[in-house]
């Protein structure tokens, strides 16, 4: 017998969300079916029974999958089944993971698998925020230790008003699109893109999202109470040796403090820290250094590193590289360091370095997005690569990971608002991280801006980005906001807050908070300090190239755009694409055509102006209307016994009958001396009103003396 429990959440705008448990996937540790309108999501959570004692992190894995059948579609490809995760699915996984992960107990190390599947959709409601709610609800109805619940909502600003969880259609009209993940009390995660908005406007949006999240969290608590899972499983995943912990702190604290205050570069600091721990291990005999003991030494040593770094910042305002809290690392940049791409730039900030290149292409280079709910074409692409050598790792690079997709997406969202509207080229920016010690995604934003300017793309305004950090004293009220954080400050700190924008406002942001109880006052201060930092970085960038180049690079493909009446689109394409293919072959150009707003938009790409002009002339000929009485120079396309077919305008052919070639009577077409490919002047003498066929004449253009001679000759021959 099915004993399902349902909880309904009223969104306050006529929409409701239902959470149901006890009906589907009952063998999972927790399972929730979420429904809103025609959207149905199943979220399950399972935990491994055994735990590895030598693991000091949470092995959490979040998977989000959209079924093509959810929208009544067949998957593509030969197998006709879902394949690897799309970028959208990966980004959704990351949004959920980043909100859930900080809320598991720090000493909980069991493998946890969260699986979310979209089983039904009407194509209107956006499922990613609902997936976060479903995942949290599945954890809430399980006995897995979890300090939630959380929920996620999307907040969009449309015509000056905030809309929670807008539809795809509504989101297209928004100038602000932010995903927020939070508990009832605290913001945990923020990510979004904006059209150059102020810090105050962004904070208002976050507050609006948080208010919408609170009742969703309350509903999950009530659901857990009904199910009976408010009391979570007890666990003991860490074995501790307090005597060893005390010994390490007593002997190593001052040494670690000295290294932390020395302000060394990353590699030297790592070597110095490693030397300290290796020296400490020498006091033990080899047989005493079991795997478990080495593991504990590393863990306790890490605790000291974290405490020392935090105390240096909070007590002395000194960071591990010697900077003050608001200080930005040294910056240098260069444009056009490599000449092959259509634009390139290097941006270096401290020990983080990005090389960005720009390639300008045709409409044929558009990225086709064929996801379950999103069918679109992308004209601005940004790809982010993070090779192992960027951090000095000796390993092979095995494809693109989730992290690279996530970082690339953030940089893409930061730059997209400043790309010119209706820009004729498809743009691809590639960022290769050559060195990394904190905030390589924001270095990508800066390098990407410089490379676009070097390529001659007339961006609306240049963008810079910065990563902010936070050190918060739990026992007191002291905190420090850090500008331009290092990798260690990200790892050991309490917040990673990336902000990108122009002088006018913010274009993208991403925030992950690792602690509870962060006030809006602290967020406001962090945003204000971030603004100062990114404006400083932007000024440094503009010293290298103050504005976009006025001209494209010489080897950039040339482009010409022509708008034609809709009814001529078929004439330009021709039957089976015959006309447009011939145009491209004969002129050496690439031609694309599409219908936009009941007009035909033709883009002609070529390596030089001469080839583009040739194609343009031919197209203008195709779309021009032939007029009776006009004289044209046509090309002989084919010769028949009864005459020749002449193309007198591109795509327009007519018959030059044998009787219209010469005033002289021709017994056969061969007497005319015509050859395929020859050019001949003709006059359009008539257009058949029924068939639309063109009647051509060449003899009518011949001198009258030839006509008189031909007539006399014919009369003489009759005598």
UniProtKB/Swiss-Prot annotation:
Cellular component annotations (GO), alphabetically ordered: cytosol
Binding site for Mg(2+): 490, 496
Cofactor(s) for this UniProt protein: Mg(2+)
Molecular function via GO: 3'-5'-RNA exonuclease activity; magnesium ion binding; polyribonucleotide nucleotidyltransferase activity; RNA binding
EC number(s) recorded for this UniProt protein: 2.7.7.8
SUPFAM superfamilies noted in UniProt: Eukaryotic type KH-domain (KH-domain type I), Nucleic acid-binding proteins, Ribonuclease PH domain 2-like, Ribosomal protein S5 domain 2-like
Reactions listed under catalytic activity: RNA(n+1) + phosphate = RNA(n) + a ribonucleoside 5'-diphosphate
Main location: cytoplasm
Domain S1 motif: 629-699
Single Gene Ontology BP annotation: RNA processing
Domain KH stretches: 557-619
Enzyme type, top EC level: transferase
Keywords: Cytoplasm, Magnesium, Metal-binding, Nucleotidyltransferase, RNA-binding, Transferase
Intracellular or extracellular location(s): Cytoplasm
InterPro entries in the cross-refs: ExoRNase_PH_dom1, ExoRNase_PH_dom2, ExoRNase_PH_dom2_sf, KH_dom, KH_dom_type_1, KH_dom_type_1_sf, NA-bd_OB-fold, PNPase
HAMAP family: PNPase (MF_01595)
Entry similarity comment: Belongs to the polyribonucleotide nucleotidyltransferase family.
Described function: Involved in mRNA degradation. Catalyzes the phosphorolysis of single-stranded polyribonucleotides processively in the 3'- to 5'-direction.
Protein name: Polyribonucleotide nucleotidyltransferase
Organism of origin: Azobacteroides pseudotrichonymphae genomovar. CFP2
């Amino acid at each position: 017998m099915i004993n399902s429990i349902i909880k309904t959440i009223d969104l306050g705008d006529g929409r409701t969300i239902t959470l149901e448990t006890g009906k589907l996937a009952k063998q999972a540790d927790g399972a929730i079916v979420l429904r809103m309108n025609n959207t149905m999501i199943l979220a399950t959570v399972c935990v491994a029974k055994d735990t590895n004692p030598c693991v000091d992190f949470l092995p959490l894995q979040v998977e989000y999958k959209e079924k093509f059948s959810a929208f009544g579609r067949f998957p593509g490809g030969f197998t006709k089944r879902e394949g690897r995760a799309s970028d959208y699915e990966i980004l959704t996984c990351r949004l959920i993971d980043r909100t859930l992960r900080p809320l598991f107990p720090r000493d909980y190390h069991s493998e946890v698998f969260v699986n979310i599947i979209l089983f039904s959709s009407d194509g209107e409601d956006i499922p990613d925020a609902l997936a976060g709610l479903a995942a949290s609800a599945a954890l809430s109805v399980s006995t897995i230790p979890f300090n939630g619940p959380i929920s996620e909502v999307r907040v969009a600003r449309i015509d000056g008003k905030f809309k929670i969880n807008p539809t795809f259609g509504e989101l297209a009209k928004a100038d602000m699109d932010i995903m927020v993940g939070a508990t009832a009390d605290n913001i945990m995660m923020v990510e979004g893109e904006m059209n150059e908005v102020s810090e105050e406007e962004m904070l208002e949006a976050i507050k609006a999202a948080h208010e919408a999240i609170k009742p969703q969290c309350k509903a999950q608590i009530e659901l857990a109470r009904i199910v009976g899972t408010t009391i979570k499983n007890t666990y003991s995943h860490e074995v501790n040796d307090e005597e060893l912990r005390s010994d390490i702190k007593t002997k190593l604290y001052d040494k670690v403090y000295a290294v932390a205050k020395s302000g060394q570069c990353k590699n030297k600091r790592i070597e110095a820290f490693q030397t300290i721990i290796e020296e400490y291990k020498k006091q033990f005999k080899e047989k005493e250094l079991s795997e478990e003991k080495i593991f504990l030494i590393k863990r306790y040593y890490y605790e000291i590193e974290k405490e020392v770094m935090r105390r240096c910042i909070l007590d002395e305002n000194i960071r591990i590289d010697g900077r003050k809290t608001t200080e930005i690392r040294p910056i240098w940049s260069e444009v056009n360091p490599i000449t092959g791409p259509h634009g390139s730039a290097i941006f270096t900030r401290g020990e983080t370095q990005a090389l960005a290149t720009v390639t300008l292409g045709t409409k044929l280079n558009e990225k086709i997005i064929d996801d379950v709910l999103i069918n679109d074409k992308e004209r601005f692409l940004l790809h982010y690569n993070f090779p192992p050598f960027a951090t000095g790792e000796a390993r092979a690079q095995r494809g693109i990971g989730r992290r690279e997709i996530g970082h690339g997406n953030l940089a893409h969202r930061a730059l997209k608002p400043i790309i010119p509207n209706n820009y004729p080229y498809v743009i691809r920016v590639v960022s290769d991280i050559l060195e990394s010690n904190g905030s390589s995604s924001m270095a990508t934003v800066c390098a990407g801006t410089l490379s676009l300017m070097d390529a001659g793309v007339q961006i609306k305004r240049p963008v810079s980005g910065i990563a902010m950090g936070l050190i918060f004293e739990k026992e007191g009220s002291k905190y420090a906001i850090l500008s331009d954080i290092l990798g260690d400050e990200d790892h050991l700190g309490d917040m990673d807050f990336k902000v990108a924008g122009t002088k006018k406002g913010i274009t993208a942001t991403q925030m992950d908070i690792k602690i509870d109880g962060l006030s809006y006052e602290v967020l406001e201060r962090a945003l204000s300090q971030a603004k100062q930092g990114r404006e400083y970085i932007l000024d440094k960038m503009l010293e290298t190239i103050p504005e976009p180049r006025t001209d494209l690079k010489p080897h950039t493909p040339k482009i010409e755009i022509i708008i034609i009446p809709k009814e001529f689109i078929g004439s330009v394409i021709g039957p089976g694409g015959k006309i447009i293919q011939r145009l491209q072959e004969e002129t050496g150009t690439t031609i694309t055509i599409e219908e936009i707003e009941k007009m035909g938009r033709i883009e002609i790409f070529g390596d030089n102006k001469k080839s583009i002009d040739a194609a343009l002339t031919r197209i203008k000929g195709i779309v021009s209307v032939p007029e009776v009485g006009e004289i044209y120079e046509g090309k002989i396309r084919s010769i028949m016994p009864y005459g020749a077919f002449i193309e007198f305008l591109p795509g327009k052919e007519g018959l030059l009958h044998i009787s219209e070639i010469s005033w002289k009577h021709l017994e056969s077409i061969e007497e005319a001396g015509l050859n395929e490919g020859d050019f001949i002047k003709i006059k359009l003498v008539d257009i058949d009103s029924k068939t639309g066929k063109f009647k051509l004449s060449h003899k009518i253009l011949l001198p009258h003396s030839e006509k008189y001679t031909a007539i006399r000759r014919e009369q003489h021959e009759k005598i």
